[in-house]
Structure formats: C-alpha cells, structure tokens
C-alpha cells in the first residue's frame, strides 16, 4: 500500500512539463458528475487554451448508440487537489457535434442571461449554502446512525462537537481544504441539524462563476467520499419524519441592492420572485415537495412568504440588511440537488430582466 500511495503522490514536475487535465461534465440525470483525464503538453491558465473533447453519450443517457458522440467545451479551470502540481480540474459543458447544447447543459442558457448587459452591470453576487448527507455505503443509512435505528432527537447536532454528535468531520475538513487549494471560493462549513448532514458555503462569487464553483465543489466532495468509502447524498429529504431536509439556500445581491437605498430594490425584487413562485419552485430541485412542508425551517411549497430573520419564510432578509437599508437576501427554496446554473440565472432573470408589468 505504501508503494501505491507513493505512486499516487508522485511529483512529475522534475521530469516533464506535461500535465494531467481532468475534464468534468454533468451526466444524464442532470445531477451525476462524470470525468476523465487527458495529458497536455504543458501548463495552461485559461479555458480557451484547452482542446474540446468528446465522450460516449450513450453510456451516460445523453445520446443514442447510433449517434453517441457528445462534445465537451472547457469553461473553467481549477487546481487539482488530488494530483496537485500543475495538474488541473476542468469544468465543461456538453454539446452536440453540430454545436447545440444538449438538454442537460443548463450552463449555456445561464451564460446568455449572465452576459446580458443589464445583468452584467448589476454585478450579481451569490453565496450558496450547499447541504448534503453522508451515508454508509453498504446500507445507505446516515453516517453515525445505528443500523436500522435512529439517533437521539435533533438538537445537539447543529454545529455540534463530539463523537456522539459529529459524524464525518474528517471528510468535511478534507473537502474544505481541497476546495481552498483548487481555487473554489469556499467560505465556510458547519454541521447541520440532522446528524450525518453537513453544509459548505461558496461565495460571494460573481455570476456564473458561483455555479461553476458549486459543481466543482460537489465533484471534489464526491471524490473524497469515494476515497473514504462513504456515499454523499444530495436528496432534499433523505430520511422521512421529524428530521430536517437538505437545501441549497441561495444568498443574492445586485450592485444597486448593495448601494444606498438598496433595501427598496430588494423589496421590489422579492415581489417579482413572489409573482413567479411556481416557475421557480418547478426549477429548484426534484423532490423538493418532501422538504418544503412548512416544518423544519422551511416555508410550505405552495405559499410564498418573506420576512426579516424568518427561517420559516421562502425569502429571508437579514437584520443587518434591514438596519443598514442595503445588502442582500436569501432564497431558502432551492433544494440540495438543485442545478446552480438554473437557480442563479433564474434569480437574475426574474429580478433584473423580467418585467412584471408586461
């Protein structure tokens, strides 16, 4: 095993300029991540320097066998925390050979929204709180839970410490540091209300970069749990009953919201979000109806409600924002399995581009 570990950690920089690029893309479910690696002649610093590539879409549920080639376009580069050195992770999106985005490519539509001049001038900031649950591989039961049984009631686990309250901290800390190494703008972690559930935060990041970073952070997390022999679940309600679900609360602000008088801009934006509540809910993650019940710090899925410091609301405004008259708000509706390209761009589209008077 020591030899294998030595080879895995082999430093190639002293013998070759060649690097390994791990191309990452989203698979056929819209939630599964796939990746494969290729050798490049030397270090690169921009996605435009990278070649496009292809994969067998019939094996990912994204193309028929008789016309299976899907083309991936490099979009964002991150340092590889697993291979280290000059090796890189490359976030890609997927297209047909004719250059059309395939149905699971939500990045292309998001990029159009974020490149709109009206959106660009607002310099949209996002801070996304990604919750997830760690599961025992052989049983699909949360880490730290007795097999076929339940731990004590919720209460001591949120931000808890101790062997009877925090399960999987090594994984969480490894992920935190790996994301920082990679260049993901990860801003924090914490244990969640349900035991075995954790959260990491990404942001504030501007525009589509926030979504790229969430996807790469998810990829890094999946790779780390693979090493540990643990399964990560993004199911919004992994355990039925009196247990918290898992969300991806999305904090958002625009330039005008962050300036003097921004609170009025925030209230107008929230009004627009309320008018398009059904459209947003439909795009905010599969199975979200199991989570948004009006209990466990959620609003009912059929009701739009906003409030200051109200964690039972659809949209929460912080006390500091109310006091200062400017700042940001939190959309608490997105599920943990949401597509960040969809959620971030839809919030921008509704609050900046959508005319609720037309």
Curated annotation (Swiss-Prot):
Domain of life, source organism: Eukaryota
Keywords: ATP-binding, Cytoplasm, Ligase, Nucleotide-binding
InterPro entries: Gln_synt_N (IPR008147), Gln_synt_N_sf (IPR036651), Gln_synth/guanido_kin_cat_dom (IPR014746), Gln_synth_cat_dom (IPR008146), Gln_synth_gly_rich_site (IPR027303), Gln_synth_N_conserv_site (IPR027302), Glutamine_Synthetase (IPR050292)
One GO term (biological process): glutamine biosynthetic process
GO molecular function: ATP binding; glutamine synthetase activity
Entry EC number(s): 6.3.1.2
Pfam family, one: Gln-synt_C
GS beta-grasp domain ranges (all copies): 19-99
Family statement drawn from the similarity comment of this UniProt entry: Belongs to the glutamine synthetase family.
Misc: Irreversibly inhibited by the herbicide L-phosphinothricin (PPT).
Self-association state and partner proteins as the record states: Homooctamer.
Protein name: Glutamine synthetase
Source species taxonomy: Eukaryota, Viridiplantae, Streptophyta, Embryophyta, Tracheophyta
């Amino acid at each position: 095993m020591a030899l294998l570990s030595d080879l895995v950690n082999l430093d190639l920089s002293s013998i070759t300029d060649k690097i390994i690029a791990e191309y990452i893309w989203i698979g056929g479910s819209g939630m599964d991540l796939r990746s494969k690696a290729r050798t490049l002649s030397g270090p690169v610093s921009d996605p435009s320097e990278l070649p496009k590539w292809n994969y067998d879409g019939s094996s990912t549920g994204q193309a028929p066998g008789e016309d299976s080639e899907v083309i991936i376009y490099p979009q964002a580069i991150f340092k590889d925390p697993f291979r280290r050195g000059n090796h890189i992770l490359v976030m890609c999106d997927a297209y047909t050979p004719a250059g059309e985005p395939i149905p699971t490519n939500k990045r292309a539509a998001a990029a159009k929204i974020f490149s709109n001049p009206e959106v660009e001038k607002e310099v949209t900031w996002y801070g996304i709180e990604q919750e997830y649950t760690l599961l025992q591989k052989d049983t699909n039961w949360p880490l730290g839970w007795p097999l076929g049984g339940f731990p004590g009631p919720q209460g001591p686990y949120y931000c808890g410490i101790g062997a009877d309250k925090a399960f999987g901290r090594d994984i969480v800390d490894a992920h935190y540091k790996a994301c920082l190494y990679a260049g993901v703008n990860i801003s924090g972690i914490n244990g969640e209300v349900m035991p075995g559930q954790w959260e990491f935060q990404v942001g504030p990041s501007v525009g589509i970069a926030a979504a790229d970073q969430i996807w790469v952070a998810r990829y890094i997390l999946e790779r780390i749990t693979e090493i540990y022999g643990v399964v990560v679940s993004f199911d919004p309600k992994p355990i039925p009953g009196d247990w918290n679900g898992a969300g991806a609360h999305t904090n958002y602000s625009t330039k005008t919201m962050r300036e003097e008088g921004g609170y009025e801009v925030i209230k107008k934006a929230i009004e627009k979000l309320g008018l398009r509540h059904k459209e947003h809910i439909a795009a905010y993650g599969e199975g979200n109806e199991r989570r948004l019940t009006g209990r466990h710090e959620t609003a009912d899925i059929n009701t739009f409600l906003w409030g200051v410091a109200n964690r039972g609301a659809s949209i929460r405004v912080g006390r500091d924002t109310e006091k200062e008259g400017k700042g940001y708000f939190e959309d608490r509706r997105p599920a943990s399995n949401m597509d960040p390209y969809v959620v971030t761009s839809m919030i921008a589209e509704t609050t900046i581009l959508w005319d609720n008077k037309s």
